[in-house]
A protein has these predicted regions:
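Glycine-rich phosphate/diphosphate-binding loops that line cofactor/substrate pockets in enzymes
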Residues: 35-44, 88-98
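Short alpha-helices
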Residues: 133-159
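Short Gly/Thr/Asp-enriched flexible loops that form oxyanion-binding sites at enzyme active sites
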Residues: 111-125, 144
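Short glycine/serine/threonine-rich phosphate/pyrophosphate-binding segments
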Residues: 58-61, 84-88, 109-115, 138-141
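Glycine-rich oxoanion-binding loops at beta->alpha junctions
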Residues: 57, 64-97
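N-terminal amphipathic/basic leader segments beginning at the initiator methionine
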Residues: 1-49
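Gly-rich Lys/Arg/Thr-decorated short loops/hinges at beta-loop-alpha junctions or inter-strand turns
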Residues: 44-52, 61-74, 137-141
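Short glycine-rich or small-residue beta-strand-to-loop segments that form or flank ligand, phosphate
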Residues: 2, 47-54, 70-73, 99-108, ...
């Protein structure tokens, strides 16, 4: 299978740049740390919705940022959870006075890093709650996973 990749070390950054160029009316892309927010912010007094996870399954997660969906998305490296630092920046940008809800897929790295970011946000007086999505019916108990993962159902939770 042929992939459209210029540089494997810059694939996430280049994907975000392309997404921003294709949808400037929908999203704003922030760099260092990398995350995506809605171009038109949600009204004050509304809960901000933030999700994220490893890159490599685009348009997930940035493709679900916009009106009626996520307020921010945090991409990790390819197939790798984002670290707490960019996860912390996203709720800061997505908070509209009513707290933030992290929508997290049940992958160990995602859960650990989003929970760590939620604790850090709490220290900055940003109220963060977390929903862990574990809708994967293919895996219940396995030596290789921590239970059911979050897959397609994550989209509906964000909606």
């Amino acid at each position: 299978m042929k992939k459209l990749v210029n540089d494997v070390h810059a694939v996430v950054r280049e994907t975000l740049e392309g997404f921003a160029l294709a949808h400037p009316d929908l999203v704003d892309v922030h760099y260092s740390p990398d995350f995506v927010t809605r171009h038109a912010p949600k009204a004050e007094g509304k809960v901000g919705l933030v999700s994220g996870g490893g890159s490599g399954h685009e348009p997930l997660h940035a493709g679900f940022v916009g009106e009626g969906m996520l307020d921010a998305a945090v991409p990790g490296a390819v197939f790798t959870s984002p670290t707490p630092d960019p996860i912390l920046e996203a709720p800061t940008a997505a908070a509209h006075g009513a707290g933030v809800l992290h929508i997290v897929k049940n992958y160990t790295g995602d859960v650990l890093n989003f929970e760590t970011a939620a604790e850090l946000a709490d220290m900055e007086d940003i109220q963060v709650s977390t929903v862990i999505v574990n809708d994967d019916v293919a895996v219940e108990d396995s030596l290789y996973t921590a239970g059911r993962r979050g897959v397609a159902g994550t989209i509906f939770v964000g909606k």
